[in-house]
């Protein structure tokens, strides 16, 4: 009877725990989804930023024409006159995922536009990311820690920044694939099962198809295997898991057209292959260990490892030298040397996401989890095992990379949420332990302890306290106060995450918002206004020149041909556009004529104080152009005499006469941005411009938006017979005037007449 009651009690507890887990995960999914809809509520269902516009355009093309034609799609509206082969230059996982969801909904007679699927894809996947994080943390620590981690990542600003509604980018689905791949890797390592390793390889294949950050996975998992070997934790489970995963993952990843043979021909993938080979050697050594003497084993191990290691290094450098294996890319070098990209590849350094992360960003995106994260890391180090070595390596490497590049804050956030969940869970378990359970367990062993002497009892109590932890000597009031403080911190995290998501990460870049003194909202829709004008008032084959930041938006919203866009695959072509922007009007006209440019688009924020305009980006245009055309463009020529970058009174003549300056400030000298400001006062820079009377000779103003944010100019077509100016009409005759001889004066002879014979 007692055993039956105990079984029923245990079964009811398991059922209640399962129900609670499902409810918490469902709430985390719902809260994560709802908190990402601020942009939809305030504005409308619209695609955000820059890259998402190309992703949406590519997805729309795939849904209309099919996947096969998508892979063979040649985009003639990009990179004129070169064009772009889309299928072999994109990660198709995002498009395939959206297309599959759209097909399923359409099959169920839920007819929605593909744009709505794209807008709501990232918020939907945030719930899947929370579940994947729960599964990973559960394998690493406990179900309670998993629930904490799932709730953290559901609303963490570090992840929300790339997954709000409308942010249709690769990261929206890639973080789910990242966490799920890590979960399957830990599961396969714990079980040593080929099935889990195969599932891990399939999840990795999805990650490869979705985001270029898959390189982080294919280097972190080998690093984990190498660390286990060095720590003496080699096992057959590790051999089966890694060998199965690496072979399948490499073959599957090569099926993505954009990746191709990179897994076997690039340096970024060679560490994984090296660990694979090392694992075979270690397995062979373990096999031979019980079959030869210890001295023979040490000789074979040390000698064989040294020879094979040296041979591997020689073979690698020979393959790189011979061109069979590509060296490390510039982006890889920029992770180890933050100044490398600025000197050698300015196009990489010009991207704001590639800048180093400030200290404020860590606390802004992570809040209290950044402070608790080291606690969870310490708990994992204190109670280390095979799988916890993985999260330790993940955390340390992610912290470093996030400090080097602000974009990689996205890869740090999952690790922080996992370790913060472990930290909070373990702390709450310590300070909220059931007192009745402790008293019951102590009373069962109390009868034998009462018979012992006081000094013996004191020693036993001391040893028990040492085993249970320091919290045993803490009173219930102190435990209650600490628990309340932790709950307050968690509530503060929720408030902070909601505030940051609402005010910092839920504003589409194509729609700007400001407020008046009395709090009324002002919506500035200049971007879409300009793109709509281009779509309605220019020829279908018109070519638009702009800086590469706006290429995807022009192609997506205006449906016009661009010279460069956000793909940035051709540095020399971008440098040519930068040279045109940096040159004087006549030199720029020659470049634009060669490129068949019809319209030029620039972003100017001097009227409304928009800091992300082209004048503030102009130095990057100069640097990129200088890299390809050092004889024509020199960065120092655009500085003042004191070495400052300015468009004000002290600006250099080169700066005042360049095409970018003229297009930005044309007619601006006549404009007053405030009652107490002089004409030509630039709100963004905070001073009056250096040259107000700007005239244009080779281009003409075509359209300027309401708030002067977007300005469009048209390249003039020069006439075949140029008009001669009046002051140049008199042609001077050089040479001496004849004053002597029979040729002194001219003689007019009568015209010859024809007579009939």
UniProtKB/Swiss-Prot annotation:
> Which residues take part in binding dolichyl diphosphooligosaccharide?
407, 552
Record keywords: Endoplasmic reticulum, Glycoprotein, Glycosyltransferase, Magnesium, Manganese, Membrane, Metal-binding, Transferase, Transmembrane, Transmembrane helix
Q: Identify the main location.
A: endoplasmic reticulum
Topology Lumenal: residue spans: 35-121, 161-171, 209-210, 262-269, 321-358, 405-408, 496-757
Task: Output the Gene Ontology cellular-component terms.
Answer: oligosaccharyltransferase complex
Q: According to the UniProt entry, which residue ranges have a biased composition of type Basic residues? A: 734-747
Q: Where in the cell is it found?
A: Endoplasmic reticulum membrane
Query: According to its UniProt record, what is one Pfam family this protein matches?
Result: STT3-PglB_core
Cite the position(s) of the site with description Interacts with target acceptor peptide in protein substrate: 51, 353, 617
- Annotated region (Disordered), positions in chain: 721-757
Q: Indicate how the chain sits in the lipid bilayer.
A: Multi-pass membrane protein
Magnesium listed as a keyword: yes
Q: Single Gene Ontology BP term?
A: protein N-linked glycosylation
Pathways involved: Protein modification; protein glycosylation
Cofactor(s) needed, names only, are: Mg(2+); Mn(2+)
Quoted from the entry, the domain comment is: Despite low primary sequence conservation between eukaryotic catalytic subunits and bacterial and archaeal single subunit OSTs (ssOST), structural comparison revealed several common motifs at spatially equivalent positions, like the DXD motif 1 on the external loop 1 and the DXD motif 2 on the external loop 2 involved in binding of the metal ion cofactor and the carboxamide group of the acceptor asparagine, the conserved Glu residue of the TIXE/SVSE motif on the external loop 5 involved in catalysis, as well as the WWDYG and the DK/MI motifs in the globular domain that define the binding pocket for the +2 Ser/Thr of the acceptor sequon.
Q: What is this protein called?
A: Dolichyl-diphosphooligosaccharide--protein glycosyltransferase subunit stt-3
């Amino acid at each position: 009877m007692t055993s039956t009651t105990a079984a029923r009690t245990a079964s009811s507890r398991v059922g209640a725990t399962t129900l609670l887990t499902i409810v918490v995960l469902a709430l985390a999914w719902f809260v994560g989804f709802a908190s990402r809809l601020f942009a939809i509520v305030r504005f409308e269902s619209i695609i955000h930023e820059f890259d998402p516009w190309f992703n949406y355009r590519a997805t729309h093309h795939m849904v209309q024409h099919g996947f096969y034609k998508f892979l063979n799609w040649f985009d003639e509206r990009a990179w004129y006159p070169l064009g772009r082969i889309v299928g072999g230059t994109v990660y198709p996982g995002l498009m395939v995922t959206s297309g599959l969801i759209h097909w399923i909904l359409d099959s169920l007679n839920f007819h929605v536009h593909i744009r709505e699927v794209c807008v709501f894809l990232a918020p939907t996947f945030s719930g899947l990311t929370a579940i994947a994080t729960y599964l990973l943390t559960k394998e690493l620590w406990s179900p309670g820690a998993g629930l904490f981690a799932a709730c953290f990542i559901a609303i963490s600003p570090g992840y929300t920044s790339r997954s709000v509604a409308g942010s249709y980018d690769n990261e929206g689905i890639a973080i789910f694939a990242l966490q799920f791949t890590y979960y399957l890797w830990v599961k396969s390592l714990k079980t040593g099962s080929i099935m889990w390793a195969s599932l891990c390889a399939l999840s990795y294949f999805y990650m490869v198809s979705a985001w270029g950050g898959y390189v982080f996975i294919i280097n972190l998992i080998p690093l984990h295997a190498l660390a286990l070997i060095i720590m003496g934790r080699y096992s057959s489970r590790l051999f089966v898991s890694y060998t199965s995963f690496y072979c399948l993952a490499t073959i599957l990843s090569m099926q993505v057209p954009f990746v191709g043979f990179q897994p076997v021909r690039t340096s970024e993938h060679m560490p994984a292959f090296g660990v694979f080979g090392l694992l075979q050697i270690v397995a062979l050594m373990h096999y031979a260990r019980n079959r030869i003497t210890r001295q023979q084993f040490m000789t074979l191990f040390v000698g064989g490892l040294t020879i094979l290691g040296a041979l591997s290094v020689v073979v690698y450098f020979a393959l790189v030298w011979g061109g069979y294996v590509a060296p490390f890319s510039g982006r890889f070098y920029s992770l180890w040397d933050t100044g490398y990209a600025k000197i050698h590849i300015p196009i990489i350094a010009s991207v704001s996401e590639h800048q180093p992360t400030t200290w404020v960003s860590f606390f802004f995106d992570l809040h209290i989890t950044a402070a608790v994260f080291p606690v969870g890391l310490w708990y994992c180090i204190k109670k280390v095992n095979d799988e916890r070595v993985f999260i330790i390596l993940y955390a340390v490497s992610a912290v470093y990379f996030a400090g080097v590049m602000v974009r990689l804050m996205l890869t740090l956030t999952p690790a922080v949420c996992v370790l913060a969940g472990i930290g909070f869970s373990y702390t709450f378990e310590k300070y909220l332990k059931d007192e009745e359970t402790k008293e019951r367990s102590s009373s069962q062993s109390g009868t034998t302890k009462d018979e012992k002497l006081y000094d013996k009892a004191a020693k036993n109590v001391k040893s028990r306290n040492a085993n249970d932890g320091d919290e045993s000597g803490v009173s219930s009031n102190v435990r209650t106060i600490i628990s309340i403080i932790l709950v307050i911190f968690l509530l503060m995290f929720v408030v902070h995450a909601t505030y940051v998501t609402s005010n910092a990460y839920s504003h589409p870049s194509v729609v700007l918002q400001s407020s008046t003194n009395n709090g009324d909202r002002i919506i500035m829709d200049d971007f879409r206004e300009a793109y709509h004008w281009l779509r309605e008032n220019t020829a279908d084959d018109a070519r638009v020149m702009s800086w590469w930041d706006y290429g995807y938006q022009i192609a997506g919203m205006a449906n016009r041909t661009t010279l460069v866009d956000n793909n940035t695959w051709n540095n020399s072509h971008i440098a040519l556009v930068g040279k045109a922007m940096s040159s004087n009007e006549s030199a720029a006209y020659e470049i634009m004529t060669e490129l068949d440019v019809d319209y030029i688009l620039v972003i100017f924020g001097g009227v409304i104080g928009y800091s992300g305009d082209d004048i503030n980006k102009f130095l990057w245009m100069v640097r990129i152009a200088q890299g390809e055309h050092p004889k024509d463009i020199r960065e120092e020529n655009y500085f003042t005499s004191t070495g400052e970058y300015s468009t004000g009174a002290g600006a250099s003549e080169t700066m005042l006469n360049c095409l970018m300056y003229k297009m930005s400030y044309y007619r601006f000298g006549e404009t007053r941005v405030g009652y107490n400001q002089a004409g030509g006062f630039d709100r963004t820079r905070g001073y009056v411009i250096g040259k107000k009377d700007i005239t244009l000779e080779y281009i003409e103003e075509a359209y300027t938006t309401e708030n002067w944010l977007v300005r469009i100019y048209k390249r003039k077509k020069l006439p075949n017979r140029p008009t001669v100016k009046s002051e140049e009409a008199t042609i001077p005759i050089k040479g001496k005037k004849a004053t002597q001889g029979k040729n002194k004066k001219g003689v007019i002879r009568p015209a010859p007449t024809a007579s009939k014979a």
